[in-house]
Each structure stands twice: as structure tokens, then as C-alpha cells.
Amino acid sequence: MDSTLISTRPDERTVSLSRARRAALGSFAGAVVDWYDFLLYGITAALVFNREFFPQVSPAMGTLAAFATFGIGFLFRPLGGVIFGHFGDRLGRKRMLMLTVWMMGIATALIGILPSFSTIGWWAPILLVTLRAIQGFAVGGEWGGAALLSVESAPKNKKAFYSSGVQVGYGVGLLLSTGLVSLISMMTTDEQFLSWGWRIPFLFSIVLVLGALWVRNGMEESAEFEQQQHYQAAAKKRIPVIEALLRHPGAFLKIIALRLCELLTMYIVTAFALNYSTQNMGLPRELFLNIGLLVGGLSCLTIPCFAWLADRFGRRRVYITGALIGTLSAFPFFMALEAQSIFWIVFFSIMLANIAHDMVVCVQQPMFTEMFGASYRYSGAGVGYQVASVVGGGFTPFIAAALITYFAGNWHSVAMYLLAGCLISAITALLMKDSQRA
């Protein structure tokens, strides 16, 4: 019997509700910071970075360059997953989670004071890419640790609900980042916003970091991780990520396929559509900034509600339903954009970025972490999650913008791209064994 798996189902009596709540709150607080910082970059890249950091190229190429730097962060996420996962499996989840918040906050604040191309020339985009890489490295270690600590600390029959705070943090981060950018945008002229207004949300990250560190300081390691330490002497002979790859190679491919729906629905609605609707359709930028506010606010309710349903009726059922809703909403979303119908744009944005997206993300924490043994779970789930981020999400706005450019503004290829990703996720979930019922 695999000793690393002995501790995957600890006696329910050892699970402390107090510890579970602190773990859920700490995971949520850190996730808010990391996702606020990470998503803020995507929003600002769509509005500002093409002109502030890439003014020497055409508007279309500037947009592609800005979205390419957005994707750079995703390239460094697997590396963060490997490094933080390795030490998280050896030294504990909490230490790594404190470090990820520090790194993300510092990198984001530095972007807020970064001089533009007109001041320091090509050093501006070089430094921007460097700081974006640090952001990606930090968030690469965040999800695995936060998901594990909340799942391992949760009662057996409420793992989706207690760990949903990791994804609610995404919604709150989206709400805060979009809300602050929208507020600054309304309070400033276009010239003021491009000159200094966009920097304020990046500097505000410092406040969020201090709050998250205070909350996370009260967390404890999970009972499951502490039990696993009995087998640490044997585990030290193996590198955790290698152990995960050797024992569960198929799990990484499953995670990539399962995350396509989540990544494409969110980044097409919140990042790509913001640029496409303003540059190609002539719609006001406030439209998708306000949609981002709405989506972020609703997700704070929909994610825990869907997680509760998943604990009660089955994670896989909820996942498949969400992915199919994304599949069916892909073309109608772009048809609404073409018709410039505000009602239907908002409706299908919610269907994609709230209903479809939130139904799949609410169960990912227990679904993905239970694919791996406890002694290499941080590495396995974390790296798998972040590799999927690169393959399925990091360059989604870039790919979508490139498709629009290649097909001379025609949106059908992007809609098909979105539809295919959601359908692949639905089929993968359908073919999986339901570990919740095992």
C-alpha cells in the first residue's frame, strides 16, 4: 500500500471546525490579494499598456504586445508551482502561502511606480515583463497551497464548500480590481488616466497585502499534513513533483482539459472582450468594466452556492453542467456583441463568467487535490493547475486578438475557440471517475 496515501482520509474526529474556518478564511484572504494583483494587470493591459509601454508600434501590434506580457505571467506560474510545491510538501503549506502574498504585493506595487516608455525607453517594457514574471511565479505557488490547506482542513462531506473561498477570492479580486479601475476612470480624464490614474490601483495592493498577512498569520497547518509528517523520512528520498508525475501522469492532462472552460470563459469576457468591444465595436470601456464589477460581485454568491450543491449532489454533475452552459453560450455572446445589445451582452457575460465559470471552479480544489497523495499533493495539484493556466489561459487574450486580426475582425473563430474549450472540459469530466463517491 502506498504510504503517501494512508493519510488522505483522516478520521473525521481529527478535523477541527475552528481550524477549518481559519484555513478557509486565510486561503480566501490571500487569494483576494493574488487575484486582485494578477487580474489588475490584465485589465490595465487592455486599456493602457499598449500606449504607455509599446507606443513605437501600430495600435494592433501594441495590443498584441500588451497581451503577450499578460501571458508572460502564466509562463512562470508552473515554475512557481514547482518551487513552492516542493517546499510546501516538505516544510508546510502556511510558510509558502505567507511568501506568495509578499512577492505578489511587492511586484504589483513596483508596477505602479514603473516609468513609461517615454521616460526610460525600452527599459520600461523590459522591467514590466520582469515584474509580470514575478507576479506569475508568486501566484503559481498560491493556488496549490491555499486549495490544499482548505481542503485538508475541511470536514469530509463539505470539502467543496470550505475550499470555495479560494475561488471566491478570485471573484472579490476581480470586483476590487475592476471596481477601482472603473472608479479612477470615471474620476479622471483620458489623459489623466493614462498619465497617472492607472497607477493608483497597483499601489493600493500594499493595503491588501498587509491585511492578508495578518489573517494568514492565524492559520494552522492541516491535521492531514501533520499526520503525513510521519512518512516524511521516506518522502525526502524523492522529489515531490517527480513522484506526482510518475504515479499520476494522466492527472496532469485531466487538469489541463478540465480547466479549459474556466480559463477561456473568464479571460475572454474580462480581458479580451474589454479590448475588442472598445477597439472594434466602438462600445464604451465602462461597459465591460461594469460587467467585471457585476461578475465579481455575483461570484461571491454563486461560487459558494454551487459548491454547496456539489457537496450535496455531486461535484462531477455540477462541473459537467457548467461546462455545457459555457459551450452553449459561446456564439450567442459574440452575436450580442455584434448586435451591440447591452442587455444580451450582460446576460451572456453572466452565463459565461458567472454560471459556467463558477460551476466548474467551485469544485476544482477537492477534485484536483484528491488526484494526488498527501506527500506530493502540493507539487502535483499545484503544478498541474499552473501548467493548465499556461496551456489554456495565459495566452487566451493574445490568441483571441490574433484570430481577430488574422480574420480581419471576424469573431466566429474566437467563438469556436471558446466553444471547443468548454466542450473538451465537459467531455473530460464525463469520462472521469467520481472520486467523491469512491
Task: For each feature predicted by the language model, list its residue ranges.
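Multi-pass alpha-helical transporter architecture, strongest
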Residues: A212-M219, M367, L419-A438
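Cytoplasmic membrane-interface "Motif A"-like loop-to-helix N-cap segments
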Residues: R90-V101, R312-L324
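Extracellular/periplasmic helix-loop-helix junction of adjacent transmembrane segments
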Residues: A45-R77
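Glycine-rich segments within core transmembrane alpha-helices of 12-TM secondary carriers
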Residues: F161-S185, G384-T396
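Helix-to-loop junctions at the C-terminal end of transmembrane segments
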Residues: G81-R93, I303-R315
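Extracytoplasmic gate region of multi-pass secondary transporters
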Residues: G42-I43, P249-L298, G392-P397
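C-terminal ends and interior cores of transmembrane alpha-helices
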Residues: W102-I120, I325-Q340
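C-terminal transmembrane helical hairpin of 12-TM major facilitator-type secondary transporters
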Residues: R317-V363
